[in-house]
Every structure is written in C-alpha cells, then in structure tokens.
C-alpha cells in the first residue's frame, strides 16, 4: 500500500465522475449510523479549529480560500508526483502537513494521503465513484472526513476507518459546526449533523428538499445516490445543493445555495444552528431567486456581514447575511464560476477558468471597487491567499506555472514552472508551514517551498 515517488531534483523557474430502494427503507437508514471499524482511542472532543492547515476544499468555515500563515515569495519546486488518476477538487492539508486528495483512482485508491515533506504515499483508501466530487476535510488530529455514494466516513491519520454513516445522496465537502460536530449536506438537500467522534447523528435530519413519503406515495422510489451530480456542474433543479455550505462560527449560521423543488432558480438560504444537548438546524431566511445558477460555494466576508456568490455567467454578487438582501454585483467575465478567495482584510480575488484574468476587487459597502487587473495573466485554476499580502494562482497554456503575486498591487513577485503539466488546476492550497501545493486535473501533484 506504500510506495515512494521520485523526489524532484528540478528546481526550475520560468515565466511561464441503480439500485431500487423504497422510501421507507432509506428513511430508516438515514437516521441510523453504521459504525464500522471504530479505531479512535477515545471519545474526547477534538479541537476542530486548532490548526493552521488547509482544512477543506476552501480552507476554512468561511470558504475564504485564504490562510493567515505568511506566504513565501521565494518558492522553488520541492517535489512532484503522479496521482494515477484525474482529480476534480483541491486537496486538504492537515496540521502535520499531510496532503489528502480524492480522485477517480481504482476501487482501492480513490482517497490518497501523502507526506507533505516528501510526497511519499502514506495510504490509499477506497471511495465510491462519486468521492471525487468533494474534498476530504482534515481536523486538528489529522483525522479525515470524506463523502462518497450514500455515506460519510471518517478515517484516522493511518488510513483506518473510524466510522461510516449512511446518508441520502452524495455529500458535498463537509464543514465543522462551532461545537465540532460535522455538517454533512448532500446534493439532494439532506442535511445531517454528526458527531465527529462516532458518526452518530446528534440532530434531526433536515431535508431542505423533502423526499417522497411512503404514506403519500407508497410506490415512490428514492433517487440513486449519485443522481444529479452532473447537473451540479452546470446548475439545475436536479441538483438541489451543488457545493459546500459556508459556516459562520461566531453566529452559528450556515449559508447554502439551494434549488428548491419546482423553483425556476436557486436561492441563498441561511440556517440557524443550535448546539448543546439537543442540537438542531432550522431555516432563518432565504433570498429572492438568484439571477442565474450558482455551482460554487458561498463565501463569507471576514466580518461575517456579507455572503459572496459567483454565478455560472461569471458575476460575483454580494448579499447581506442579515436577511439575504442583494447588495451589489460585479461581472468578472468569461464564465469564471468558481468561488472567490477573500483575504483577512477583505480583498476579493475571483476564481480563474474559462479565460478569466487575474484581478482583485474590494467590497466598498454598497458597491464593488476594482483594485487592479492583470490582462496579461489568464488563470488556469482558483487562487489561494496567504498572510503578508501574498497570493498564488496557476497560469499558462502549453505548460502550467505557479505565479506568486502581491495582493495589494497585483504585481508578479515569483514564477515557478510545473514541469510536464497541462490543462488546468482545481486550485492552489497553502499548508501550515507556508508550503504551496498544486494539483492538476489530469492527475499530478506539485509542492513548492
């Protein structure tokens, strides 16, 4: 199960994814946890928020795609390795530097964990074929939380299964709630709150899109777990929840883009989480219908007063977290539909893809303010932001490069080649020691220090 990649000696720099099940059966399964291979040594709470790694797909509860760790401006290629299969999402990085990637690998190797210092494979685990659609999230003990077809699982740092819980659908990238419980939403809108230690449901299931009830429709069948996942890529009613929610720990509020049954467009929805002995979730408000489909995650401003959405047309829109009122919009262009990155001081960098140029804006209250734009740099993936006013993104055509830029001015401060890379990157991530890790969609991993 272990192997070693050949550590790159090159330190080059150059500019440049059907079972038929009746509703009665799944309604029982959805409220019971299938506890398998419990390998945790204790049941003490885990300080979920106690590390500086890249916790999940978009780094943190706010989905900010930023870290406070000071970003290096003098990077060199440290190692590179093939994944053996395509990947569609960013990796996560745990507090020990462990890099975890989901891919379309064979049945036994769709969840890969790699040593941050060397790129050596630590373990490879099985996931269902839809596991590639989300990122495995890391906690402060380097436990992982990964979703696949009809289940949510937790794996310890050695690759052993801690617990596995059935859900209805395929989980989007999970989030942690303020008390450390795991928030699991599927593309069908089923919302679960699970204990991070045992996987047991600690709150009633909230179905944002109610499934068919046996008494109302006795012959109705539930949808296969992976139904509608392709729709999540483009936006449509078959995918109620296309991407991971954002969580504001300070107000215990969850924000999600939801396409309700029968609606002609999605809405931004806020859920209030109540912890304690009897945790629960309930809807607080919903915005007006959105002007266009949204397939990326909502992102919170640093002070929690705004939610930023990017629609499939390439427009960034700001909404009030008080009641979902639309505030302003900014057209990025070129159908760049990924989530924005937001620095701790509020600078917003839109995602790349589809030919969008690297640029930055600021939320000026009732309007967006353009800070700078690089017409010469077309992003081939989503950026990451770090402390010290430093940002990273992927550019290039025939071969990709990692570009380090000054967040305040947009100026390039470093360019590092990614030898042999083509296509695009799901996005850049930054580790606890300032290491920068870049996956490519075709299945390679590059680490810079």
Where are the predicted features?
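Bacterial N-terminal signal peptides that target proteins for export
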Residues: 4-28
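C-terminal motif of bacterial Sec signal peptides marking the signal peptidase cleavage site
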Residues: 35-38
């Amino acid at each position: 199960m272990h192997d070693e990649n050949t550590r790159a000696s090159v330190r080059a720099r150059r500019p440049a994814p059907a079972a038929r099940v009746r509703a009665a059966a799944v309604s029982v399964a959805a409220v019971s946890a299938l506890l398998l291979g419990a390998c945790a040594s204790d049941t003490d709470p885990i300080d979920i928020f106690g590390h500086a790694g890249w916790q999940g797909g978009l780094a943190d509860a706010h989905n900010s795609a930023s870290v406070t760790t000071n970003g290096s401006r003098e990077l060199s290629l440290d190692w590179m390795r093939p994944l053996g299969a395509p990947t569609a999402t960013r990796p996560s990085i745990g507090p020990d530097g462990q890099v975890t990637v989901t891919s379309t690998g064979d049945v036994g190797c769709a969840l890969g964990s790699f040593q941050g210092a060397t790129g050596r494979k630590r373990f490879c685990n099985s996931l269902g074929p839809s596991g590639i659609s989300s990122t495995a999230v890391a906690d402060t003990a380097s436990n992982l939380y990964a979703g696949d077809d009809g289940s949510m699982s937790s794996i310890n740092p050695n690759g052993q299964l801690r617990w596995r819980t059935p859900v209805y659908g395929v989980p989007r990238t999970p989030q942690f709630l303020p008390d450390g419980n795991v928030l699991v939403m599927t593309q069908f809108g089923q919302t679960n709150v699970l204990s991070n230690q045992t996987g047991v449901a600690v709150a009633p299931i909230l179905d944002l899109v109610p499934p068919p009830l046996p008494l109302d429709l006795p012959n109705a069948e539930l949808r296969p777990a992976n139904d509608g996942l392709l729709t999540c890529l483009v936006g449509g009613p078959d995918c109620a929840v296309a991407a991971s929610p954002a969580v504001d720990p300070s107000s215990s509020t969850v924000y999600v883009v939801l396409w309700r049954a029968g609606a002609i467009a999605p809405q931004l929805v806020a859920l209030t989480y109540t912890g304690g002995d009897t945790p629960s979730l309930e809807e607080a408000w919903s915005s007006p219908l959105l002007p266009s489909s949204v397939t990326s995650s909502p992102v919170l401003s640093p002070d929690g007063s705004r939610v930023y959405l990017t629609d499939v047309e390439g427009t960034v829109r700001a909404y009030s977290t008080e009641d979902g009122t639309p505030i302003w919009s900014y057209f990025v262009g070129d159908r760049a539909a990924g989530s924005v990155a937001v620095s701790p001081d509020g600078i917003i960098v839109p995602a790349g893809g589809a030919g969008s140029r690297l640029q930055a804006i600021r939320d000026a209250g009732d309007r967006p303010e353009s800070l700078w734009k690089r017409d010469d740099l077309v992003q081939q993936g989503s950026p990451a932001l770090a402390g010290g006013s430093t940002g990273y993104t992927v550019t290039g055509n025939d071969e990709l490069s990692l570009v380090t830029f000054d967040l305040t001015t947009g100026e390039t401060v470093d360019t590092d080649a990614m030898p042999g890379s083509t296509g695009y990157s799901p996005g850049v991530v930054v580790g606890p020691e300032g290491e920068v890790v870049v996956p490519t969609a075709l299945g390679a991993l590059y680490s810079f220090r």
